[in-house]
Structure formats: structure tokens, C-alpha cells
Amino acid sequence: MDLWFSESHTPDVKLSVRTEEQLFVGKSEWQDISVINTPSFGKMLILNGHVLFSDADNFVYNEMVVHVPMAVHPNPEKVLIIGGGDGGVAQVLELYPDIKQIDIVEPDEMLVDVCRQYFPEFASGLDDDRVTIYHQDGLRFLRNCDSDYDIIINDATDPFGHTEGLFTKEFYGNSYRALKEDGIMIYQHGSPFFDEDESAFRSMHRKASQSFPISRVFQAHIPTVPSGYWCFGFASKKYHPIEDFKKEDWKARQLKTDYYSANLHLGAFSLPRYVEDILEEEEEK
């Protein structure tokens, strides 16, 4: 008998993946968590019925949210990850020896334990000496920060449930305050491809643009996200993602990557016309 996992992306569109076995199912204080094994994507982590990542495409997300700001900021030493309980973002950050401190704010302890057991290739990023994990609410943590971080990466899942507060105007304002005078924030911007998702996409850009002097959007192809087209926000107090991109400096590091490259950095900010139109409309409001 064929077993399939299906995630609804819109009332008319689903992602369906053949499943070999269910490896874990549980309910934490914060969310439903399951892990399945699939022939096409390997293991998949599913939260509240939505795919968070898979073995096959998690590298795209992790590399983009890390290498883009790291190739722009001249001397980042302290990084804050909101979410990040799987360890994948931290694992990529650890390629940079000049980073001295990585703080991870992940409220869900069960999620961390599940990732350590079923995704050790990513969770190894949690074991670096520079990493400290705080099991508390991300917005509450930010309220107590003041000019502390060079880079903040909002690795929250989506603007619903217990992470809803991480997509509010208050969150962007608190992130601005938590950054040093030349700090950068990276956040999930979603996809505007489906009409059902466009309003959230607009709202995020509007809030970021109102909170930061520099607000840009970049893109990546991630097969398991809705539409396969995903965007990220680059919000900065000082540095522009293209004008201040240190291409040769980053290439000199000779880091091994599977998705990000210096050439891709430039292309990632060259958005489709319909996406540019949406962003420009929000900036004019």
C-alpha cells in the first residue's frame, strides 16, 4: 500500500510526497512534530502539518540566510538566531572563525531533541563552543537586548501560532534596537506566487521598510516550500546587500558551498518583475 504525505499550500494546491515510514510523531508544548522518511527528499521534519525542511533541500535555506549577510558585513562577531533549533543555520555560521558568539533562541526543547536524534548532520551545529541555546520566546528575548548583535537571523517557521509575534512590527523594531549601529537582520519573507500568500508577503516588507533604512529582498529555489520559490528579507542599518557586497573578500575564504556563490549573491537580488512591483507598491505607501 502506498503511503503519501500531503501538505496543503492553497485550497487548490497540495504538495504530496511518497512516504516510506514515519520515524517520529509527538506533540510538544508548542507544536505537533513529526519526522517521515521519503524516497525523493530523504527525511522530512514536519511541524503542525507543514514541511519545515528535508534532507534534500535544507542546505539551500541555511546557506542563503548565512552567507548573504556574512558576505556584506565587514566584521561580524555576535550572531543571534531566533528559532534555529535544528542547528542547520548555526552549522553554516561555524564556517566563519571570526564569529565569536552564536546565540540561539528556540523555545521548543522537544524540537531540539528530535533534530539531534533524526537530523544529526544539521544538529551538530548546536555543539560548537560558540553556541548558547536559550529555551524561551524569541520576542521576549529581544525585548531585553540593546545594541548587542552584528547579525540577527529570524529562523522562525511562519507568521502563525507561537511564532506569530516574530512577524509583527514590534519584532522588527526590537530587532533594530538589538542590533549594533551597523547591524543586519535576515528573515523569512515567504513567497508571493499564490494569491493567498501575497498579503503576508506585502505586510512583511512594509514593516521592515518602516523599521530599517535599508530593506531588500532576495530569492532562492527550495522545492518543498509553497510554489518552490522562496524569498528572504535583508534589513540593515547601514550596509547595502549589493553596494557593500565584498565579493573578492568572500571568495578568498574558499568556503565549500552547495548553493550559494559570489555570482549567485548578485543574482539573488535580481527579482522577477511581478515581485518588484509588489515591493515597490508597499514602499510607496
UniProtKB/Swiss-Prot annotation:
InterPro entries: PABS, SAM-dependent_MTases_sf, Spermi_synthase, Spermidine_synt_N, Spermidine_synt_N_sf. Signal peptide: none annotated. One of its GO terms (molecular function) is spermidine synthase activity. It comes from the Bacteria. The active site is at D155 (proton acceptor). Pathway: Amine and polyamine biosynthesis; spermidine biosynthesis; spermidine from putrescine: step 1/1. Homodimer or homotetramer. This is Polyamine aminopropyltransferase. It comes from Streptococcus uberis (strain ATCC BAA-854 / 0140J). The gene is speE.
